[in-house]
Amino acid sequence: MAQPSTKVYDLIRSRIMSGTYAPGQHLVETEISQELNVSRSPVRMALKRLTQESLVTTESNRGSFVAQWTRSDINEVFDLRQMLESRAASLAAQSATPEEIARLQSLVDEMAELAQRRAEGYRDDLHHNNQAFHLLIVSAARSPRLFQFVRTLTDTSLTLGTYFYYSDADIDRSVHFHQDLANAIASRNPSAAEALMAAHLCLAHTAFETSRFGNDEQSA
């Protein structure tokens, strides 16, 4: 049975990802503990864990707040991901093992099923699937430093919450890109894999930014 702090963590994290808790929102321990009918201890532990994951920020004498991302932050993270992961996809097409290629296809199949069924909590499941897919490609590139750099970027709250801002059309397009990427790597086509990853992350960047900010230029 899951510990109270784990259940509280899962709930707060889900609310942050879905936007129920908005960026910059004050997360008051007493209010959350009363709502969830738990003591303040598991709430405090959950907020500490979320702070370590950069989903929450803690300010002295003020408390905990949902982490905020500016338009500039979004541009920086996606630009770096596009540069690094495009290179990783090219390398993966040259060095991925048959087992890794099979696993990539398995993740694509799972993603397609999740997107089709759209069961409760499917966006969170899509996030985990997506992260596993991208990190597997980077791992298959056989570059430990590249993997560490990308892992740092994909662990940000900005990247973790991407699927909660996607439209159904965005999700369907993402599934198709993942299939095309898996095919390019399986066929040992580095240039195609690199171009597909660049296009995939460029469109993901646009979809996320548009959904997150719309045309509000004041968020930069």
Which residues does each PLM region occupy?
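Active-site loop of classical SDR/Rossmann-like NAD(P)-dependent oxidoreductases
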Residues: 170-171
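Conserved amphipathic alpha-helical segments that form helical-bundle/coiled-coil interaction surfaces
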Residues: 77, 87-89, 94, 98-162, ...
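Electropositive phosphate-/nucleotide-binding environments in soluble metabolic enzymes
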Residues: 2, 6, 175, 191
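Short linear motifs at protein or domain termini
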Residues: 1-94, 210-220
